[in-house]
């Protein structure tokens, strides 16, 4: 089940403040996704879209229970701040995960952060995005507030996850998009908590990988590498420039 809201950018600070306060009642089955998008009614205007999704796919879960989990958001000031809203929509998990089969060139750099206001810092730069490009920018608010299982191998270095894959068409647009995206991440990176190893870090920022380890563990990995790969024949996945 899902509730969604559209907001003008001038109320975005208030929206983030409300969501921060609602973290106290956030259930681990509830996903909060706050994104910057082009207004469906006016592509020249940027708006904020909030989706609150309850994944109720366990035995015994019901629509009534899902509505109960969504109730704190419906009863907050989110509704009065929004320009439009759709409440308690029943959706299928397959539809939620569907992605159109499209081919794009891309760049991607995600961060963990404890400050949801990171989204505010990039609003003006977002408006300067190259034409015909698509930034799937989304803040997973309170991603790391669920039950933490100490026996699980799971890495999360902050309260919120900010994902920002950039998509575009044509190799002739590579330079413009990569330059714009580099500036975007220079704005975002000061908000990062520790470091999230991204899919392109080995190519673009190999030294960042070291930031993901304590100095002690980094030296252990270096020792193992020197033992089994003394001639450095393998890819420098450990972040050596």
Model-found features: residue ranges?
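Soluble FAD-dependent oxygen oxidases
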Residues: 1-241
């Amino acid at each position: 089940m899902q509730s969604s809201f559209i907001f003008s950018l001038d109320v975005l600070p208030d929206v983030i403040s409300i969501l921060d306060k609602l973290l106290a009642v956030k259930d681990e089955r509830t996903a909060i996704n706050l994104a910057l998008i082009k207004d469906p009614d006016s592509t020249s205007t940027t708006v904020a879209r909030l989706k609150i999704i309850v994944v109720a796919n366990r035995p015994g879960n019901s629509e009534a229970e899902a509505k109960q989990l969504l109730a704190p958001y419906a009863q907050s000031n989110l509704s009065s701040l929004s320009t439009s809203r759709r409440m308690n929509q029943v959706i299928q998990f397959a539809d939620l995960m569907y992605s159109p089969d499209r081919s794009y060139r891309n760049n991607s750099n995600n961060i963990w952060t404890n400050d949801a206001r990171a989204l505010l810092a990039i609003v003006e730069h977002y408006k300067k995005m190259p034409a015909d490009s698509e930034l799937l920018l989304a803040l997973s608010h309170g991603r790391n507030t669920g039950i933490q299982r100490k026996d699980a191998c799971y890495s999360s270095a902050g309260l919120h996850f900010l994902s920002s894959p950039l998509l575009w068409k044509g190799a002739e647009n590579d330079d413009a998009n990569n330059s714009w995206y580099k500036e975007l991440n220079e704005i975002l990176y000061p908000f990062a908590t520790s470091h999230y190893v991204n899919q392109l870090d080995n190519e673009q920022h190999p030294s960042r990988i070291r930031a993901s380890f304590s100095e002690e563990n980094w030296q252990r990995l270096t020792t193992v590498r020197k033992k089994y790969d003394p001639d450095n024949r393998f890819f420098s996945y450990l972040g050596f420039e």
